[in-house]
A protein has these predicted regions:
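N-terminal subdomain of nucleotide-sugar transferases
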Residues: 2-71, 76, 396, 416
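Carbohydrate-associated surface elements
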Residues: 57, 183, 201-204
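Membrane-proximal helix-turn-helix segments that form the acceptor-binding/catalytic region
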Residues: 123, 127-131, 157-179
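Acidic anion/phosphate-binding donor-loop and adjacent secondary structure
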Residues: 189, 195-200, 205-221, 242
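Conserved donor-binding/catalytic core segment of Leloir-type glycosyltransferases
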Residues: 222-241, 247-250, 262
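Nucleotide-sugar-dependent
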Residues: 241, 290-298, 306-327, 332-345
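Nucleotide-activated donor-binding/catalytic signature segment of Leloir-type glycosyltransferases, i.e.
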Residues: 264-265, 270-297
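A short, well-ordered alpha-helix in the C-terminal region of glycosyltransferases
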Residues: 370, 377-391
């Protein structure tokens, strides 16, 4: 009888996994930080949840596919170059129009999860969650419209008010809002979001796939960097990163013969940065496109030290996620940010780098020269960086924190 009972038990249907409906314009194969982070998160959550992502169009990819356990649905949307504000707005609009219909006819989820691309996607997510009477989780990577105002990209008070009307109510209505730092938590609470609903989960690196390598590696040799002292920026080349200061800093270091300043990435200000380097005859600056993630360990490890910049006044409105990959690669950091920024606090806490004021090329050049001349123990800073990456900022740790938040909401059940 025991054998029969065991056989019958094995025929019982497995309990259904909770269904997540995830909304964000950017996902794999996008090179955006949010695309990479969301892809890694969703693929990890697919082990315990049924995950569907509704994202924007990608050339050459099917409208619907299953990748690493995640169902990826791509709506019809434009894919114009995002460096031009109007074209980016068209991309946003076409994606949101496709998203509304596709999300509303989706299979009923147990949870709706939204990131913040475009910044006002939370308004759509709120409507979708209400339609299915399910909890809403918003994962906040940037605080809008404040970041655009601080950068001088949004000067119209009327437009700022409109954006706040589109964005802030969804944050206040969400069952949980995940932010990526304590300073950002304060910014969000200032918008009227209940502190009880806010959770802090920093972004992460992947200590399994990104690991320290020797400076003299294949990538370094291919780019003729193996025998040079390399200062690197790897990531978005946008308005928030304040990379003008890095290019200008090199003009104070013309006497450092073996110096190379390598800027890897793309973004709205890439062409301007190339033009600035030419104008200043900053011959030590090399600007390269995004590198394949498969060789990230090599490219990041080529640097003797990395620069992570953030424009003055942006602390808590955006957090450069690339710092976690740098830590995983076991490399030190020059944080050219306000002291209250998450990056500056992290570097000071871990002891993996030095802090300089943002937007100050001379101070940045002094830190670069000191690093080159051996005034810092770069090897020890790198060891601390890697140890922190393994123990505190690895993807597995962040994913478990997200699972804890999801379990809170799953226990709350449907909205009434």
């Amino acid at each position: 009888m025991g054998g029969v009972a065991a056989a019958l038990s094995s025929l019982r249907p497995m309990p259904e996994r909770p269904r997540l409906l995830v909304l964000n314009q950017y996902y794999w194969p996008g090179v955006e930080a949010t695309a990479n982070l969301l892809t890694e998160l969703c693929e990890a959550l697919a082990a315990t949840h049924e995950v569907t992502v509704i994202t924007g169009a990608a050339r050459g990819l099917p409208r619907r596919q299953v990748r690493n356990g995640v169902t990826v649905v791509r709506v019809r949307s434009t894919t114009f170059d995002r460096s031009h504000l109007f074209r980016r707005g068209v991309n946003y609009t076409t994606y949101l129009l496709g998203l509304i219909w596709r999300a509303m006819v989706s299979k009923r989820p147990d949870l709706v999860v939204s990131m913040t691309d475009p910044p006002f996607i939370g308004s759509i997510a709120r409507v979708v969650a209400a339609r299915f009477r399910t909890p809403l989780l918003i994962i906040l990577q940037d605080v809008f419209p404040e970041i655009a105002i601080k950068l001088g990209r949004l000067k119209s008070p009327a437009a700022a008010r409109l954006l706040r009307l589109l964005i802030d109510p969804s944050l206040r209505a969400a069952d949980r809002v995940v932010v990526i730092g304590e300073t950002m938590k304060r910014r969000v609470e200032a918008k009227g979001v209940s502190p009880e609903r806010v959770r802090v989960i920093p972004n992460w690196g992947d200590a399994a796939s990104v690991a320290p390598m020797g400076h003299d590696n294949d990538w370094a040799r291919r780019h003729k960097l193996a025998k040079r002292f390399v200062v690197m920026h790897s990531g978005n080349i946008g308005h928030a990163q304040n990379l003008d200061a890095l290019v200008r800093a090199t003009t104070f270091l013309r006497d450092v013969d073996d110096l190379a300043v390598v800027i890897i990435g793309s973004g709205a200000r890439r062409s301007e940065l190339v033009a600035l380097a030419r104008l200043l005859k900053a011959d030590k600056v090399e600007i390269l496109p995004y590198q394949d993630r498969a060789i990230l360990s090599q490219s990041l490890s080529t640097a003797d030290i990395h620069v992570v910049g953030l424009a003055r006044g942006l602390a808590g409105y955006v957090v450069p996620s690339r710092v976690y990959g740098i830590l995983a690669a076991g490399r030190p950091v020059i944080a050219a940010t306000d002291p209250e920024s998450e990056t500056a606090q992290l570097v000071a806490k871990v002891g993996c780098g030095v802090l300089v004021p943002p937007g100050n090329p001379f101070a940045l050049s002094a830190a670069m020269r000191a690093a080159h001349d051996g005034e810092y123990d770069l090897a020890e800073m790198g060891r601390r960086a890697r140890a922190f990456a393994e123990s505190e900022s690895d993807r597995t740790i962040a994913v478990q924190r997200y699972r804890d938040v999801l379990h809170e909401l799953e226990g709350a059940g449907a909205r009434h």
